[in-house]
């Protein structure tokens, strides 16, 4: 998984996805399929994207009792996607069960999907962490604790804000994947995410992968927006 860009397909239908991807017909993308799209289209959208040569992050954020997560992951592994995730808040036993399910469900000769854990959603503020979730630690402490649990459980990495990447790399190692949503161009609106950075800032902070959605999918010219993403990652933004 060398390409650091993951394009979030935040659509509710396969038709919208096909319309968006049409200009990319000769490009293999790394795309994210989330709840909205998967719950509407099911496994068919995964098969379609794979046939087009795209790599897939299936972003369903599983969080349930260990046995349920194990069986769910066993089924998802058969789709042969590249990356799946769980909520770290489910605990070590649940995360270990997720890996067991992936190992059991991965077809012979195939590589099991990478599995990462969500630490805290990028829509979660420090105030929300304390006042609504009743977590009495700082955001940084909470994220690091969850990342450590994910590593202890054998997971391949975490989903986190880019601002938390340096701390996670320090404590969990350079090989531990950091997948960072909340990526916006400098002139974009933040929308419902509060812990956001630009592509180049994420690179400087050491992110393994960045997830970017509306900045590309809602752009008037998605190809130009994707090229801008590549330029910003290199620190070569056009003026």
Swiss-Prot record:
Gene3D superfamilies: Aldolase class I. The active site is at 61 (proton donor). GO terms for biological process: 'de novo' pyrimidine nucleobase biosynthetic process; 'de novo' UMP biosynthetic process. Keywords: Decarboxylase, Lyase, Pyrimidine biosynthesis. It catalyses: orotidine 5'-phosphate + H(+) = UMP + CO2. It comes from the Bacteria. Pathway: Pyrimidine metabolism; UMP biosynthesis via de novo pathway; UMP from orotate: step 2/2. The keyword Ligase does not apply. SMART domains: OMPdecase. Its EC number is 4.1.1.23. GO terms for molecular function: orotidine-5'-phosphate decarboxylase activity. It is an enzyme of class 4 (lyase). Pfam families: OMPdecase (PF00215). InterPro entries: Aldolase_TIM, OMPdecase, OMPdecase_AS, OMPdecase_bac, OMPdeCOase_dom, RibuloseP-bd_barrel. Belongs to the OMP decarboxylase family. Type 1 subfamily. Homodimer. Catalyzes the decarboxylation of orotidine 5'-monophosphate (OMP) to uridine 5'-monophosphate (UMP). HAMAP family: OMPdecase_type1_B (MF_01200_B). This is Orotidine 5'-phosphate decarboxylase. The lineage of its organism: Bacteria, Bacillati, Bacillota, Bacilli, Bacillales.
């Amino acid at each position: 998984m060398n390409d650091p860009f993951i394009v979030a397909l935040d659509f509710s239908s396969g038709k919208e996805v096909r319309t968006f991807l049409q200009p990319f017909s000769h490009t293999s993308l790394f795309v994210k399929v989330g709840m909205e799209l998967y719950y509407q289209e099911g496994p068919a959208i995964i098969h379609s994207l794979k046939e087009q040569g795209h790599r897939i992050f299936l972003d369903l954020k599983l969080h349930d009792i260990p046995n349920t997560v194990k069986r769910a992951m066993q089924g998802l592994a058969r789709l042969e996607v590249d990356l799946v995730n769980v909520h770290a808040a489910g605990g070590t036993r649940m995360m270990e069960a997720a890996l067991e399910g992936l190992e059991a469900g991965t077809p012979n000769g195939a590589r099991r999907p990478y599995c990462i854990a969500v630490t805290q959603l990028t829509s979660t503020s420090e105030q929300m962490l304390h006042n609504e979730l009743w977590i009495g630690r700082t955001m940084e402490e909470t994220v690091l604790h969850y990342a450590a649990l994910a590593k202890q459980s054998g997971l391949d990495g975490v989903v986190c804000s880019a601002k938390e990447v340096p701390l996670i790399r320090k404590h969990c190692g350079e090989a531990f994947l950091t997948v960072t949503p909340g990526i916006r161009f400098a002139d974009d609106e933040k929308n419902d995410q509060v812990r956001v950075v630009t592509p180049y800032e994420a690179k400087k902070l050491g992110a393994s992968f960045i997830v970017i959605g509306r900045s590309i999918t809602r752009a008037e010219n998605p190809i130009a927006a994707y090229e801008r993403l590549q330029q910003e990652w290199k620190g070569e933004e056009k003026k």
